[in-house]
C-alpha cells in the first residue's frame, strides 16, 4: 500500500494540509496521478472553490471512479466533503461523485452574513474515532456558503442560521 495522498483537485491549499500531516509525523504527497491515487493507503480530498471546477478537474484526470470505488479511508475537507454527495446547487447545479445520497444546498442563514466565515462549534452525540481527544462543542473554522443537510450520515452538527452537517461518514468516506 502507498502513503497518504492529498488529492490535487486544482482548487485548494494543499501545502498547508501537507505541512500539518508531516508535522504529525506522517508521510504524504500531493498528486492527481490515477495510478498513485488508487494505490494510496489513505486519501485526503481538500477543496476550496466550486463544485463545478473540482468535478471538471477530477473527471478530466479520470479520478471520479477511482474515488467512488476506493475502499481505504478517504477524508473530504470542505468542498471535498460536498463532492462526496450526489448533487450541488452551486453553479446552477452540478452532478457530484454520489457516494452520499444527499444534495449540497445553499446555506439559508436568516439574515446572517454569507459566506459563513469564522469559528463555530460542532456538536456530536456519536462516539467516533474521528473525534478522539476532541471535546464535544469544540470550535472549528468555517468558510462556506453551501451545506450538507443533516441526514443519516451526519456525525456532527453546526448551526449558522440553520443546522447543517459539519461532519459526515458513510463507510470509509469521512468529512
From Swiss-Prot:
Known EC number: 4.3.2.10, 3.5.1.2
GO cellular component: cytoplasm
GO biological process: L-histidine biosynthetic process
Catalytic residues identified in the record: 78
Pathway membership: Amino-acid biosynthesis; L-histidine biosynthesis; L-histidine from 5-phospho-alpha-D-ribose 1-diphosphate: step 5/9
Compartment(s) of residence: Cytoplasm
One Gene Ontology MF term: glutaminase activity
Disulfide-bonded cysteines: none
Protein name, UniProt field: Imidazole glycerol phosphate synthase subunit HisH
Gene name per UniProt: hisH
